[in-house]
């Protein structure tokens, strides 16, 4: 749908296709939305502009069109008369900065040699103060390492995009990719992975704040070729059904994505994140198993200097929404990995589907 909207098809053809799609989606696109209403002052301006056009004073009419555009309106001149509508959030964003609609539009640098020590990747799903705190934590604790921070503005409408543009001017090591709509958690992070130029990648959540030197420890851990993923908050499970936050140090079955680090070269080995995970929950577990499937370890160290703040993606939803989205994502994980107890640490690990014990 998004590719069609952004295509070179005539407007009428796009509208016909959207209405046909909407027979399935049920969004009532054929009904004029209240957002398309214009203020009485705009209606008066259109009448004055129409008078200029009738008198062939097109210079004055064009000047008024430009003013209406600056005020946030699209003016449409047709044989039946002139109409105007407010610009959509998408149109307003596209006027401010270049944006993408999917990770497929992003060039991958993964086949090119690393140019830096570290790449931070942040999926910015809104909440500007959280994003600012997270970025400052990254950039204030780089030590002697060369770093870049890739922040994906994931369709935000709360001023996050504007904040990121301001921070770009202050931080040359910051790179920003704007998305014209919410593309999902995995797709957003894949943009960062594909664009990364650091030897090691650190994926952070906006709720996490770095408060000290984490990069020396990460570099040391990832110098071990047997370690695939390293981070502070490890998980364990005996049966693929319940992952417990109880691994403070050493090997774990999975790592929570509040902070997870891995070598950039391994992305070509294990693949990108699965973009069927639009909601964040269980994506981290799924990606860890992509590493474990290649014989790589997941290692935890809870002493890393990070603080977890309120996780907005969790608290902004009610219990029903959280449970439904989490359940669907866990089903995606189980469908792929549920019968792979051989990837778990426990000697008597049990697969979800067969519930047959596997012995290492």
Predicted regions and their residues:
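Conserved donor NDP-sugar-binding/catalytic core segment of glycosyltransferases
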Residues: 209-244
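Short aromatic/hydrophobic "clamp" motif used to bind/position activated sugar donors
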Residues: 201
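Glycine-rich, basic loop-to-helix element that forms the pyrophosphate-binding segment
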Residues: 179-196, 246
């Amino acid at each position: 749908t998004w590719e069609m909207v952004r295509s070179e098809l005539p407007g009428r053809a796009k509208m016909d296709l959207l209405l046909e799609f909407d027979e399935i989606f049920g969004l009532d696109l054929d009904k004029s939305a209240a957002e398309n209403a214009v203020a009485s002052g705009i209606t008066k301006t259109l009448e004055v502009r129409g008078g200029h056009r009738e008198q062939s004073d097109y210079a004055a009419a064009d000047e008024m069109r430009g003013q209406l555009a600056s005020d946030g309106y699209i003016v449409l001149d047709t044989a039946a008369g002139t109409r105007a509508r407010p610009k959509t959030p998408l149109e307003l964003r596209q006027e401010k900065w270049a944006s993408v609609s999917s990770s497929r539009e992003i060039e991958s640098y993964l086949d090119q040699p690393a140019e830096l020590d570290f790449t931070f990747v942040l999926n910015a799903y809104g909440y500007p103060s959280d994003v600012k705190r997270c970025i400052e934590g990254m950039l204030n604790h780089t030590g002697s390492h060369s770093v870049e921070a890739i922040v994906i503005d994931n369709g935000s409408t709360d001023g996050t995009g504007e904040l990121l543009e301001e921070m770009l001017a202050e931080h040359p090591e910051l790179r920003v990719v704007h998305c014209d709509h919410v593309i999902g958690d995995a797709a957003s992070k894949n943009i960062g992975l594909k664009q990364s130029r650091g030897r090691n990648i650190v994926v952070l959540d906006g709720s996490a704040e770095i408060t000290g030197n984490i990069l020396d420890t990460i570099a040391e851990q990832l110098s071990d070729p047997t370690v695939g993923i390293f981070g502070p908050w490890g998980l364990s499970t005996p049966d693929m059904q319940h992952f417990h936050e109880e691994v403070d140090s050493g090997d774990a079955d999975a790592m929570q994505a509040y902070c997870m680090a891995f070598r950039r070269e391994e992305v070509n080995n294990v693949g990108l994140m699965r973009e069927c995970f639009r909601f964040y929950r269980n994506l981290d577990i799924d990606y860890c198993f992509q590493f474990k499937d290649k014989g790589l370890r997941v290692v935890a160290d809870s002493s890393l200097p990070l603080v977890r703040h309120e996780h907005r993606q969790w608290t902004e939803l009610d219990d029903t929404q959280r449970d439904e989205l989490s359940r669907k994502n866990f089903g995606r994980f189980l469908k792929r990995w549920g019968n792979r107890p051989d990837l778990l640490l426990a000697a008597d690990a049990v697969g979800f589907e067969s519930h047959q014990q596997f012995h290492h």
